[in-house]
């Protein structure tokens, strides 16, 4: 019993001696924390700085992460999108997502048409409409026939028509004793493109267009009357001009003039006119959409893709039958970039973000503003954007974004704009 008491007393003495030390240690720990609060915050900031400086993702990885995040939008639960981004300086793919998925391109189809035309026809190509005659001119009387030869120039305007009539007057013609013909042999008789909707505002597919309407001959007769040139006939007919006919006047418009309107304003008439110039270049008369498609397929094969994988129907993108991919558009943009005979003409025709054309009201601020040069595409259920931009590292990029099955076009446009901002930001 005495031993037990002594043992307990000894234990209590030890605990009493140790308690101040234990309490001091706890206080010291609390003081350390309190005294070093500022240091702790500084250390935390230092870690973040180090992470930003040394652990920062390369630019290409930042783009990938950012695009992956954008693709998590609920919009893509009910719609489809294909994206491809290509670094033209490094000549390598930066990003791809369902880039081979077939999509309706809407007006980004005009990119395919423009690049094909520049490749086939060249930047110096001219759209022309010619006035010719047969017979003789005696004492102010043209004893013969007059031919208006259509070249499907969508830009032919009042000044051009005036030049036609003035040229006749300059030759001393006061009256025409013969017939006046419209030579429409340049293209086939199809008035609508394959797969066009009947209720769309479709362009007039005529080799002789005036004021966007099929009223060329009507206006020509009116101009003759205004100029005091008497015409003995009662109307006009359609007939191919003989090779022996003499030229009175030819009016030209340049490739760049047509491209500018076609791309900046997404003009369907201009695009279809371009399409039939491509067809006409094959030598097949009358020119047809089929001939133009064959030229497109040749170019697709030239850039290393299989044309059998795509469907081409028209030059404007109005057709519901067009099916392309983001990969195809990017490969064509890459091809154009590498050809000094194509790129200057193409690039100056593209809408500039926040500046002009169909991109004037988009990307009006931020890094994409004034940087992105791209063709828009919009039809019911489809939004597209494809073109060029410059990354913060100075590299030129080309990209294609094709979005199908959409209910709210503004959401799809916003998505495409965010993609462009991501590509352009540092």
Positions of PLM-derived features:
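Bacterial Sec-dependent N-terminal signal peptides
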Residues: 1-30, 44, 54
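C-terminal soluble interaction/assembly domains
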Residues: 311-314, 318-426
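Beta-lactamase-like hydrolase cores
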Residues: 27-89, 93-101, 166-171
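Active-site SXXK
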Residues: 91, 105-123, 180, 219-224, ...
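Soluble periplasmic/extracytoplasmic beta-strand elements of cell-envelope proteins
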Residues: 82-86, 95-96, 113, 145-149, ...
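A small/polar active-site loop signature that marks catalytic segments
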Residues: 213-349
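Second-shell loop/turn segments in exported
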Residues: 49-58, 96-105, 146-156, 165, ...
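Active-site-adjacent, His/Asp/Glu-enriched structural segments that form or flank metal-binding
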Residues: 126-188, 196-203, 210
